């Protein structure tokens, strides 16, 4: 399971011209689910996202997690994170989870995160437009 996290000052996701999820300060989490993923991996990744220290403390050092920074999460499903790009000029999605498994683990991941923080979401399998202001920029690839 993969999370591409970006520290943002604001982010939103639109579907068919309508904003369905919006946050202020926090993390935009682009979530990719792979074939071998399960709830245990989702638990580990949620814990890592919630506790990863990428917000500045009073000394301007990355020392606070999103909870300590009183931030929010915008979680968006992104199957392309599971792409194999090692060969050729076209990505292969053979490592990606089936839509049923991906949706189940996406919803489970959202539920786990929502136990700790305000969460907004995208729409699974929809064509979405994601807008953000990356603060830093600060972006990390987390894989469990």
From Swiss-Prot:
Compartment(s) of residence: Cytoplasm
EC number per UniProt: 3.1.1.96
Cellular component annotations (GO), alphabetically ordered: cytoplasm
Record keywords, A-Z: Cytoplasm, Hydrolase, RNA-binding, tRNA-binding
SUPFAM superfamilies: DTD-like
Catalytic reactions on record: glycyl-tRNA(Ala) + H2O = tRNA(Ala) + glycine + H(+); a D-aminoacyl-tRNA + H2O = a tRNA + a D-alpha-amino acid + H(+)
UniProt GO MF annotations: D-tyrosyl-tRNA(Tyr) deacylase activity; Gly-tRNA(Ala) deacylase activity; Ser(Gly)-tRNA(Ala) hydrolase activity; tRNA binding
Swiss-Prot/TrEMBL GO biological process terms: D-amino acid catabolic process; tRNA metabolic process
Main location: cytoplasm
CDD domains: Dtyr_deacylase (cd00563)
Subunit structure: Homodimer.
Protein family according to the UniProt entry: Belongs to the DTD family.
Comment field on protein domains: A Gly-cisPro motif from one monomer fits into the active site of the other monomer to allow specific chiral rejection of L-amino acids.
NCBIfam families for this protein: D-aminoacyl-tRNA deacylase
Function: An aminoacyl-tRNA editing enzyme that deacylates mischarged D-aminoacyl-tRNAs. Also deacylates mischarged glycyl-tRNA(Ala), protecting cells against glycine mischarging by AlaRS. Acts via tRNA-based rather than protein-based catalysis; rejects L-amino acids rather than detecting D-amino acids in the active site. By recycling D-aminoacyl-tRNA to D-amino acids and free tRNA molecules, this enzyme counteracts the toxicity associated with the formation of D-aminoacyl-tRNA entities in vivo and helps enforce protein L-homochirality.
Name of the protein in its database record: D-aminoacyl-tRNA deacylase
């Amino acid at each position: 399971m993969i999370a591409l996290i970006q520290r943002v000052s604001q982010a939103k996701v639109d579907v068919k011209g309508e904003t369905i999820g919006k946050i202020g300060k926090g993390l935009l989490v682009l979530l990719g689910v792979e074939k071998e993923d399960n709830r245990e991996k989702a638990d580990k990744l949620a814990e890592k996202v919630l506790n990863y220290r990428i917000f500045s403390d009073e000394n301007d050092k990355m020392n606070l997690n999103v909870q300590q920074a009183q931030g929010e999460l915008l979680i968006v499903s992104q199957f392309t994170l599971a792409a194999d790009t090692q060969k050729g000029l076209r990505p292969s999605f053979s490592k990606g989870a089936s839509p049923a498994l991906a949706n189940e683990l996406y919803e489970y991941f959202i539920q786990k995160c929502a136990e700790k923080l305000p969460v907004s979401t995208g729409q699974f399998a929809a064509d979405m437009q994601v807008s953000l202001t990356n603060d830093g920029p600060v972006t990390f690839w987390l894989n469990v």
